[in-house]
Design a protein with these regions (language model features):
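Positively charged n-region of N-terminal signal peptides that target proteins for export
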Residues: 1-6
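Bacterial N-terminal signal peptides
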Residues: 7-17
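Sec/Tat signal peptide C-region and signal peptidase I cleavage site
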Residues: 19-23
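Non-catalytic, mobile gating and regulatory segments of ester bond hydrolases
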Residues: 24-178, 182-294
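A structural "domain/chain start" motif
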Residues: 212-214, 286-330, 425-433
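C-terminal/domain-edge helix-coil "capping" segments
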Residues: 291-299, 354, 370, 376, ...
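A short, hydrophobic beta-strand-centered structural micro-motif
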Residues: 299-304, 345-371
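Acidic helix-start/capping segments at beta-turn-to-alpha-helix junctions
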Residues: 332-348
Length: 433
């Protein structure tokens, strides 16, 4: 690859380095023709396409959490916490070239693994991107792939903990390989490596990636299309197409789903946190679509009413708020209806009444920077309000306040919500009046 091409690619990749690359002023539209895939919002159309690719919305959401957690930064704290609170053991790893995590737990008597590879975060990651020559796979000389990604996949595939995860699929275990951007490309090639070696049961393996670049030739693209591998992209994300600027032979995973955003957004739509938001919305939509739309419930849980002075993208805030709420699993013994739409208190009461709910849980949350702090320290104030829906009366409330450096303030919120042992019972409400 020419020096000028390498320089241009390096500059553009730096624009998207790491999960924090989010706030940019201008909307960037791709100059490339669209792939032969539909552009869909995360809803029924997306769910149908995921089903054809052999994955479901819960697997995509787990992969999104793990892919963000693979970044070794302050942004990874809440996704790691969320995975741990839902039963996953999270173990970080580093080959000296690639960072990754392995999340594992036992489900239905069999091991379940999620292997997530970090995207571009360090200078060494940038070097891997710039090793842009195409090399052939020894077992399949007609397949050519990105050299830097293939070398990374080879190193990771040889790790004993990943070999153990793959081997478990022969005895009922399951594995998801995932990653964002560079990590997505490497995860896909690990899957291709396992296909070529037949080391595990392919029916028990999934590859779910986010913003993986074009990194294989047409033969490789067709080979990827033969196993359960799906790549998610954003409609206006330029970065996954960059390699095709310097080598027209590069192609993408044919099982690609291009998401149009369910909420308006500006800037480069490449950050992993944006994919987490869309994956959460997809899972919430799927969950809600399978619920009965009528019938009484005991409790109606409205989406938190969040105000903030953090100076961040509203969608970034929304993603982390949703993550905190996802981690807060309310008791299953109650008949509960949840809502993820933002609304005013009056609308929440009206919706709760329409569902026949007795009580409404309303969570006003305020996040603010600590003005006197020289570091990025934030405070959070939360009021947990329980309302009588019919009377529109506030029955009881409880306030809490937290402070934290950086965005781990959202992990504090999740810790508080998950730490609640029970929902107040009717007798507790009566004692308050």
């Amino acid at each position: 690859m020419g020096r000028m091409h390498a320089y241009v690619l390096a500059v553009i990749l730096l624009l998207g380095i790491g999960p924090q690359a989010w706030a940019h002023d201008a909307v960037m539209l791709s100059p490339f023709p669209a792939d032969e895939v539909s552009i869909v919002a995360p809803n029924s159309s997306s769910a149908e396409m995921m089903s054809k690719a052999g994955v479901n919305s819960n697997e995509v959401l787990l992969a999104a959490y793990a892919s963000l957690a693979a970044y070794q930064s302050e942004w990874s704290g809440l996704p790691v916490s969320t995975l741990q609170k839902t039963g996953w053991q999270v173990t970080p790893g580093d080959t000296g070239h690639e960072r990754f995590i392995i999340a594992s737990q036992e489900m239905e008597g069999h091991p379940y693994y999620i292997v997530a590879i970090s995207g571009t975060e360090r200078k060494i990651d940038l070097k891997a991107n710039l090793r842009n020559d195409m090399v052939t796979i020894p077992q399949y000389p007609e397949i050519s792939v990105h050299q830097g990604y293939w070398e990374a996949a080879q190193r990771l595939s040889e790790l004993p903990q990943i070999r153990e995860a793959v081997a478990s699929t022969n005895y009922g275990g399951r594995v998801i390989f995932t990653g964002h951007s560079l990590g997505g490309g490497v995860a896909t090639l690990i899957g291709l490596q396992e296909v070529s070696e037949a080391a595990g049961d392919l029916a028990q393996m999934r590859v779910i990636t986010f913003a993986a670049p074009d990194f294989v030739n047409s033969f490789g693209s067709r080979s990827i299309g033969k196993y359960s591998a799906v790549n998610f992209r954003m409609e206006a994300d330029l970065i996954p197409r960059l390699f095709r600027l310097v080598n027209y032979r590069y192609r993408s995973n044919p099982n690609s789903i291009t998401w149009s955003l369910h909420t308006p957004s500006q800037g480069i739509q490449h950050a992993m946190v944006g994919f987490l938001d869309e994956a959460f919305y997809q899972a919430a939509w799927t969950f809600s679509a399978n619920l009965p739309t009528s019938g009484p419930v005991d409790i109606y849980v409205a989406a938190p009413a969040l105000t903030t002075d953090m100076g961040l993208s509203p969608r970034l805030i929304q993603a982390y708020r949703n993550t905190a709420i996802y981690a807060a699993v309310l008791p299953e013994t109650q008949r509960i209806a949840r809502d993820y739409r933002e609304m005013e208190l009056s609308d929440a009461l009206a919706t709760a009444r329409a569902r026949g709910a007795k009580y409404l849980l309303w969570l006003p949350i305020s996040i603010y920077p600590e003005r006197e702090s020289t570091n990025r320290n934030y405070g959070m104030a939360l009021t947990e309000q329980w309302w009588d829906v019919d009377k529109e009366e506030l029955l009881t409330w409880e306030s809490a306040a937290f402070r934290s450096g950086g965005y781990t303030i959202f992990a504090k919120l999740a810790d508080y919500l998950v730490g609640k042992e029970q929902i107040p019972g009717e007798s507790d409400f009566l004692l308050q009046n």
